[in-house]
């Protein structure tokens, strides 16, 4: 059998005519992505117990494979690993498994018998989509070890069964449900669980929920009512983005973290009585429409994308209490001409001022030690930047798309000066001018 192997990684199997039964050699720890792609001659496959990971699409379109013996040490089956293995009829997932990736067994149309360890909850979305097992599942709620993997029913009003502790990724995604009551037994709702449910109007959450993950209610454009219990400590990235009718929100008392764009485009954010959403001294979002913005004195961190695309702002003023400006904080503020930066700022995040096309000059204080990637990318009018001599770390393409006239000023030779010259931007030492 022809295997390409390097340092315990099976990189590729070269199919040989007439070989139907494949035994992977002992000592292999990883089967690399696409290693057996379209090996349609294989009917049975056995792997040694040394294998711990199967890469993305590793056995995709092995359409005649009927039987697979998995390693008893296997921890990770990556996305699409067995997609379109159309003759596979059964699979035994070993006790060692930690994660099964997105669509791992999708379109294994004859797969009817699936054995999963009793304590396994690391199941991603659509893992068994369009398999015989999923189609024949006797209940509308497909529940595996207290994990609600998928809802396949047609009811409009949903009450989550008491057997469910975790609502899985994409469990209700793009369905026509209109209302959901989550039981007190549910402890976790995973990312994108209800994304794209465009007819969903109301949701009742229990006090057992501590976190709403990324994109959980993404683009639920009819959602009008949801209670956020005080038990919630974190609302993730884009959790309610696109919920245009969501107007009545009371943030939980114990909320510690509000993700980037978590309520973007919502009626609540647009009608907020305050210009700012601030949680634990982090300015998470700006809701106002002022041309000159004074950042409140209690803010120490300007969060990721807090002012993104606020293209009516001309001037920003911040107090010296601010120590961090997050990723994309002022990205797309196309009218911004002037910004007063905190004298105690330490970190300037990725793309912080990307596409601030009216900004002509800016001074970065000596307190700054770290700058992320593309901080000033496509700032077409920016011709003068004063940089800190204490910067120790600078990301990639900070000045990408800069004006030909751009000149960077520093007080003395330093890391920032070397970085600037290396990227073919003019640099001048202030003391020598």
Can you describe what each PLM-predicted range is?
Residues 12, 33-35, 55-58, 78-81, ...:
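Consensus positions within tandem repeat domains that build extended binding/scaffold surfaces
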Residues 1-8, 14-30, 40-53, 63-76, ...:
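Structural signature of tandem-repeat unit edges
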Residues 399-401, 421-422:
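A structural signal for leucine-rich repeat
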Residues 129, 423-424:
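Short low-complexity, flexible loop/linker segments enriched in glycine and/or proline
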Residues 376, 420:
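Short acidic, glycine/serine/threonine-rich loops at helix termini
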């Amino acid at each position: 059998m022809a295997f390409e192997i390097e340092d315990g990684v099976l990189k590729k199997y070269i199919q040989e005519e007439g070989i139907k039964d494949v035994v992977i050699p002992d000592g292999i720890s990883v089967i690399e992505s696409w290693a057996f792609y379209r090996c349609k001659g294989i009917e049975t496959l056995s792997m040694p117990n040394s294998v711990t990971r199967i890469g993305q699409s590793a056995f995709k379109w092995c359409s005649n494979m009927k039987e697979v013996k998995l390693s008893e040490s296997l921890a990770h089956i990556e996305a699409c690993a067995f997609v379109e293995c159309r003759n596979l009829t059964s699979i035994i997932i070993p006790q060692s498994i930690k994660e099964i990736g997105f669509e791992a067994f999708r379109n294994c149309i004859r797969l009817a018998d699936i054995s999963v360890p009793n304590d396994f909850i690391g199941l991603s979305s659509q893992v068994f989509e369009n398999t015989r097992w999923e189609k024949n599942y006797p209940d509308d709620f497909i529940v595996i070890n207290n994990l609600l993997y998928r809802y396949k029913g047609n009811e409009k009003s949903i009450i989550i069964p008491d057997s469910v502790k975790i609502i899985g990724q994409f469990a209700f995604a793009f369905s026509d449900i209109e209302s959901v009551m989550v039981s007190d037994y549910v402890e976790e709702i995973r990312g994108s669980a209800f994304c794209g449910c465009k007819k969903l109007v109301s949701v009742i959450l229990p006090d057992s929920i501590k976190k709403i993950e990324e994109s959980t209610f993404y683009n639920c454009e009819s959602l009008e009512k949801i209670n956020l219990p005080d038990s919630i400590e974190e609302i993730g990235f884009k959790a309610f983005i696109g919920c245009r009718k969501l107007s009545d929100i009371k943030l939980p008392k114990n909320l510690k973290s509000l993700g980037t764009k978590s309520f973007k485009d919502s009626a609540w954010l647009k009608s907020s009585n305050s210009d700012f959403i601030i949680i634990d001294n982090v300015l998470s979002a700006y809701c106002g429409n002022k041309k000159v913005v004074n950042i409140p004195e209690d803010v120490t961190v300007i969060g990721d994308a807090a002012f993104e695309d606020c293209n009516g702002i001309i001037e920003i003023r911040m107090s010296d209490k601010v120590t961090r400006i997050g990723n994309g904080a002022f990205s797309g503020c196309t009218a911004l001409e002037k910004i007063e930066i905190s004298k105690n700022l330490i970190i300037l995040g990725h793309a912080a001022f990307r596409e601030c096309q009216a900004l002509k000059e800016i001074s970065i204080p000596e307190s700054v030690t770290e700058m992320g990637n593309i901080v000033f990318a496509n700032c077409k009018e920016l011709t003068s930047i004063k940089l800190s001599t204490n910067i120790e770390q600078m990301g990639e393409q900070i000045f990408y798309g800069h004006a030909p006239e751009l000149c960077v000023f520093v007080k003395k030779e330093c890391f920032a000066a070397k970085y600037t010259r290396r990227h073919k931007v003019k640099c001048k030492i202030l003391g020598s001018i």
